Amino acid sequence: MFEFDCCALGRRIAEARKARGLSKKQAAKLIGVSLSVLRYWENGNRTPTAFSLCLICMAYDVSADWLLGIRTEDKETCGS
């Protein structure tokens, strides 16, 4: 059975944010969540909902496959 790695997701969320040159505060505002929620995600303490995951993909211009670790290739736009 597949076991999901919340910490890896958090690392990818942080990596994508940094690649876009965004502070945590800027990213939280762009995604529409509180700074504490973004911190929880990046630390692997919580996982985003499917809707929030899509917002992250659009804000950071990455694919859900990449964020979730399904595909490790270069980042792609969500939905492509």
Model-assigned labels for residue ranges:
Residues 1-19:
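A short, Lys/Arg-rich alpha-helix, primarily the initiator
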Residues 51-66:
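DNA major-groove recognition helix of helix-turn-helix/homeodomain DNA-binding modules
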